Amino acid sequence: MEKDYNTLNHAFYAELLYILGLEEKKDKIVISKTKNTLAYLIKSQYNSLAEDDIISLLINYNTRLVFLRILEATMISHDGSYGGFLKIDTIKNFSVVNDLFFEVLNTPKEKRREDLPKSFSKIPYLNSSLFDKTPLEKDGNEIWRLDSRELALYPTSILKTKDKSQTTLPLLEYYLAFLQAYDFTTTPKDIQDNVKTNHDTLINSAVLGLVFEKLNGYKEGSFYTPSFITSYMCEDAINRAIITRFNAEYGWKCENLKGLEDTFKSYIGDQDKLEKFKKTFLSIRICDPAVGSGHFLVSALNYLIYMAYRLRIFGIGAEIALQNDELLIYHEGDIFQYTKPKLSDSHAQDIQHSLFHLKKSIIENCLFGVDINPNSCEITKLRLWIELLKHSYYKIEDNQITNELQTLPNIDINIKCGNSLLSNHPINSPFATSPTLDFTKELADQIQKYKSAVQRYKDSQSSKSEIIDELEGIKATLGGHLSKNHPANQSLLQNLESFVKVYGAGVFDIKTDFGRDMLMEAMNHNYYFTPTLISKEPTPMDKKGEKLLAQIKKDYEILESMKHNNAFEWRFEFPEVLDDDGNFTGFDCVIGNPPYIRQEAIKDKKSNLQKNYQVHEGKADIYVYFYERGHQILRDGGLLSYITSNKYTRAGYGKNLRTFLLKNTQILSYIDFNGVKVFDSASVDTSIMTFAKRIPQEDYAIDYLACQEKQIPKNPNFLSIPRSALSNEAFTFASGDELPLLEKIKSAGTPLKEWGDIKYGVKAGSKAFIISTAKREEILANCKDEEERERTSQIIKKMMRGANIKRYQYAWGEEWLICTFPALKLDIEDYPALKAYLESFRPRIDPIGTENGGRKKGGYKWFETQDNIAYHKNFEKEKVVWNPVNGVYYFVHIKEPMYFNNSIFMITAKDGTKLPALYIVGVMNSRLQRWLLVQMTNLIKEGDYAYGGKDKIEQLPIPKIDSANQSIADKIIALVEEILEKKKQDSATDTTKLESQINALVYTLYNLTDEEIELIEKG
């Protein structure tokens, strides 16, 4: 397995956190209590700032300083005679840091102050928003006000390896020395025999991205995506997108990359065609709608560079390879390392110039990203600037190399901050319902101005504020057109006209925003009371008028909320995906790792999601909605590739998404990482889904791969899965041999749910309701008389947890459940001793909400269990019980009354019927059923964690007992009885031979052939 150097440098990360004044606590980043860190200084200087604002300033300051260190390292690697500028003898305080930020990086050389340090003279003007003051800084929270105080060195500081006697340093000196201790680029001295040797201290842009993601990602549910994932996804999706685009544009029929390369070769020497190919290549639009640290966009950038090299449509003058998501540039067999050339016609200059401008063109034209977190957006911009900085070159004037590095362009405009899932206007919203010729022409002019202004912004070498104002004005105009056509506005105007004609405008109070706005709307649209022969005065308010007014207010509130809801308007935010008439054309490729936020954390967003997404389901996690949003913003035929949780393929909350995907997309491939921990910071099982936006054929083949380790093979051996294997009920990725077997087993049996009542255990909502035998005896001893003792003992029942259940056996753990179920309608005053015990847990057991220190809010009383448990009598019956979070899925027969917590499921006989419990236990514990569980539930493999929800387990088929199979069923039951007896005598008894006999009988029960049995045994 190829070593991935783009992994977290834990020593760097830990010490950086310490210097910044942050620490990790329970998967969160919080401000530490260490004195004289950067956070401590900010908090001391600006004591009214909220913690989020302090962290925002920290990230902003740190991002800039790290960029400066990378810039310095790049300049030194380009010019070995340059001594750098991040020296403590030059940068003596935070005031000088402030000068670097705003008087140097943010100021053209000719406009800089003359009193700046000499070492700053070679620093190029960075034409980017990274060094524009943030709103917090504009409010006076600036770095120059900070005072560098002595900070104790981190216990395992990298600085101690050089001087063990050093114990403290002033913060700024410590910070700079720490950054200087690491390499932020590879210089010629770091390359020996064409191999980089500085991996231990190298902090490349990918590693930085990982650090920034960890600093920034916990709150948003985002996790840094490993390079082996981003590189595979970008290669696969971009290849498909390029082939699709060129086939569509030139009428080609290339089926793969080799076919595309061969087609390009046939046009070598045809400059006119090559120019057209360049334009097509640079018109491919790729978007990450949850961009995070920008890892996918950087990976896409490098892969597009590599593809430009392979297709030979851009002259680069060097050989290019990709490794660990990074570009490797070779010239004449050696690793290419740009240094300041002596002659202006140097080949190295040409290579660096070509790479810089190709990267610039791709970043400006092809890469787009959105994130709800402004810090994430800044980090993404930083990473793209770093990628461009790698190939910055010295300018040429009068055929001579100068000391002036090429200025970096404004590449930040393609990365925007907003809520990707929330838009006020659908993608296909018209700018006008019945546009006139004049409006159509005016709109086309606006779109042209919009595109032109964006290009001027990217090329601008001076103040960008005027262009930004122009862009905001154009977007306001476009948004205004859409708002006029919004259903709420149309409804408001229609109802307002009807209302005023009959009831007049006197009801609108000019002192309120609503009243004033409605009077203005009525005046602007010439809505007046219209006298009639019958009504010469406005009609007094009646029920009809009140209803109209209520609807007007409702529409008004919708329109007002649109002004402040942080919506992101995909409809017009990126002019690159608008045609000349303003129609939304869409992206060629949508790629990413949407945030993983559980549905419990997005309750406040569910109402909006329900209104706007077909895939909505009450329990759906937020990544589900990104699939539909990604589909919306794709062009027809475009490709989407996401890595997400794989639960949607089988979970109940994924049914609407499954329906959507089957109806609206052609699924191209599915890579499952079930049981492989792809993300170090997340335990969720993941998969990569790739689809094309097109109406699918009736049936087609899907490429399927089950990854067993943390890598994707270079040439994956995909299985071909028929589309018919996927249904709304579940995506079952079974092979061609497995699918018929699955269908045969299903058709041979009756779903488990039809054998009896399936219920889960008791959700009490508090540990107070689960007690030990000693506590039970204490409560009973405190009863005042025998009658109370008898009553109380009747509602304290034996209970078990999942850990008490094994295959064919269980062991009660001396625990009891206080069964004060709401369904029993008990009066707690009848149980004084029990009341006294439970009262000791108040208010923790009061139904006042967890946010108020109690249990979940609900209609139950303080002494009752959280769930109603109307089926409490089922616990008293004979039952088959299983623990759905155990990877081996133990099924056990329990005859005695026994209660459970809510992690356990049971099936009992329906009233008036008998449950063949031993038969069910034998079949469900068989090898066949364990194989079936893997196919039909979220089970990973035997022994691994899984959760098989009720909706999946209840579908498992068991053959009904009839005259044809009675003898087989009797043998299974007899073997189960023998196993139970042996386990009763000695729980450690080995019963595998008896279980093997049951396995063979179960295969016969389902009429399986030897080949089918072999398939199950191998699985």
Walk through the language-model features, giving the residues of each.
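Non-catalytic DNA-recognition/assembly elements of restriction-modification systems
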Residues: 291, 741-757, 833, 840, ...
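Flexible, glycine/threonine-enriched loop-and-boundary segments that flank and lead into catalytic domains
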Residues: 45, 251, 259, 263-285, ...
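Preference for the N-terminal adenyl/adenosyl cofactor-binding alpha/beta module
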Residues: 1-306, 316-317, 341, 366-379, ...
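Short, ligand-facing micro-motifs at secondary-structure edges
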Residues: 672, 883-900, 922, 930-943
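Polyanion-binding catalytic cores of nucleic-acid enzymes and NTP/SAM-utilizing transferases
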Residues: 48, 52, 64, 540, ...
